[in-house]
Amino acid sequence: MFLAQRSLCSLSGRAKFLKTISSSKILGFSTSAKMSLKFTNAKRIEGLDSNVWIEFTKLAADPSVVNLGQGFPDISPPTYVKEELSKIAAIDSLNQYTRGFGHPSLVKALSYLYEKLYQKQIDSNKEILVTVGAYGSLFNTIQALIDEGDEVILIVPFYDCYEPMVRMAGATPVFIPLRSKPVYGKRWSSSDWTLDPQELESKFNSKTKAIILNTPHNPLGKVYNREELQVIADLCIKYDTLCISDEVYEWLVYSGNKHLKIATFPGMWERTITIGSAGKTFSVTGWKLGWSIGPNHLIKHLQTVQQNTIYTCATPLQEALAQAFWIDIKRMDDPECYFNSLPKELEVKRDRMVRLLESVGLKPIVPDGGYFIIADVSLLDPDLSDMKNNEPYDYKFVKWMTKHKKLSAIPVSAFCNSETKSQFEKFVRFCFIKKDSTLDAAEEIIKAWSVQKS
């Protein structure tokens, strides 16, 4: 009897199990079909999945590749910057949350420094916001101030995240290219690339909410002069437009040039957000600290975005950065101040890259600022038949060069909208904030390549 009951229970249980499996299969297919619709991306990121840094950083990850692509230093940051972080990491209280809009000692140091540069008082609590890198500053600014239906003017070439950030806010990017003046019998300079004032004004209208300015410029290295900035300022005032001024390379300006802040122009402080970067200032890109400076009536909206997204930035990094700033603020007129010594060091590296590229018949555009140099590489004319045909020339060239020559760079058309890619697709960008040994290795590759061609 017991065995019979057990057998019946087993059969009953098996039947239930099979029924469950059968039902779950049916339900599983049904649920999967329904849920797959919910796995689709939000419309605001439609078409934004391609990213030049993801693609080309992966290619350059091979240790045998000389990486002149991504814009990070392989030179050492200042010793005192690293020492400050080491000391601060040992202080228990500085390993906890700090003020969400910027660690008190850091915003105080920033206000002291920028009051000298702006020649005006800056409220450290209301007019400065510390962010997760300059990216964080851009994101906060665009999310806080740009709305669906707005238009934002982007100057081509532009740093590649500008367009996706504008589109994610539901706004429309409006493009205007820098155009080169004719160059006869002299070196090509970033100052030869200018905006046409009439063409620029044609991009402004009642929907224009902002223009994004980048000076010193990435990737061209252009440093806008006073006359050029005045044209932009006049149009911003005339059309009641905001200016988002990306000035992360503000200290990296070379002989004969001067960095000017558009926020210091009459009528511009009240409509400008200026963006800075610790990574570019002290060669610590991995720290991911940036800041926004502007009037309280704008900064308060950026604070709203930050408090509801990342909330705060790393306390020990902010304290170490504050102490590093104070060290250099106290010696700003001294050649040893990093704000003065780094551009001098980089100018030598820039000139070396210019000579190298010219020696193999290429035509570089000599940058007046920043730490990138772009060059027309069409004369090298390699066989790119094994590369994908549906990509711009510079994408194919850089992939070919990385694979076959073990030298990486960044295609300049990545900094362009679709309509202007053809204007820049014969250019690639090299980064020269590198150790001499890295530049030596790049020189060997380029010179050997030139010999093979001849």
Swiss-Prot record:
Its Enzyme Commission number(s) read: 2.6.1.7, 4.4.1.13, 2.6.1.63
- Which positions are annotated as binding substrate? 71, 218, 429
Which cofactors is this protein said to need?
pyridoxal 5'-phosphate
What pathway annotation does it carry? Answer: Amino-acid degradation; L-kynurenine degradation; kynurenate from L-kynurenine: step 1/2
Q: Its GO biological process terms?
A: 2-oxoglutarate metabolic process; amino acid metabolic process; biosynthetic process; kynurenine metabolic process; L-kynurenine catabolic process
Residue numbers bearing the N6-(pyridoxal phosphate)lysine modification: 280
- List the record's Gene Ontology CC terms alphabetically: cytoplasm; mitochondrion
What Gene Ontology terms describe what this protein does at the molecular function level?
Answer: cysteine-S-conjugate beta-lyase activity; kynurenine-glyoxylate transaminase activity; kynurenine-oxoglutarate transaminase activity; protein homodimerization activity; pyridoxal phosphate binding; RNA binding
Q: Which reaction does it catalyse?
A: L-kynurenine + 2-oxoglutarate = kynurenate + L-glutamate + H2O; L-kynurenine + glyoxylate = kynurenate + glycine + H2O; 3-hydroxy-L-kynurenine + glyoxylate = xanthurenate + glycine + H2O; an S-substituted L-cysteine + H2O = a thiol + pyruvate + NH4(+)
Q: Which residues carry this modification: N6-acetyllysine?
A: 116
The record ties this protein, via CDD domains, to: AAT_like (cd00609)
InterPro entries in UniProt: Aminotransferase_I/II_large (IPR004839), Kynurenine-oxoglutarate_AT (IPR051326), PyrdxlP-dep_Trfase (IPR015424), PyrdxlP-dep_Trfase_major (IPR015421), PyrdxlP-dep_Trfase_small (IPR015422)
What Gene3D superfamilies does UniProt report for this protein, alphabetically? Aspartate Aminotransferase, domain 1 (3.90.1150.10), Type I PLP-dependent aspartate aminotransferase-like (Major domain) (3.40.640.10)
Q: Which residues carry this modification: N6-succinyllysine?
A: 116
Q: Which UniProt keywords apply?
A: Acetylation, Aminotransferase, Lyase, Pyridoxal phosphate, Transferase
**Quaternary organization:** Homodimer.
| Similarity-based family | Belongs to the class-I pyridoxal-phosphate-dependent aminotransferase family.
Question: What is the annotated role of this protein in its UniProt record?
Answer: Catalyzes the irreversible transamination of the L-tryptophan metabolite L-kynurenine to form kynurenic acid (KA), an intermediate in the tryptophan catabolic pathway which is also a broad spectrum antagonist of the three ionotropic excitatory amino acid receptors among others. May catalyze the beta-elimination of S-conjugates and Se-conjugates of L-(seleno)cysteine, resulting in the cleavage of the C-S or C-Se bond.
**Name by which UniProt lists this protein:** Kynurenine--oxoglutarate transaminase 3
> Taxonomic classification, please?
Eukaryota, Metazoa, Chordata, Craniata, Vertebrata
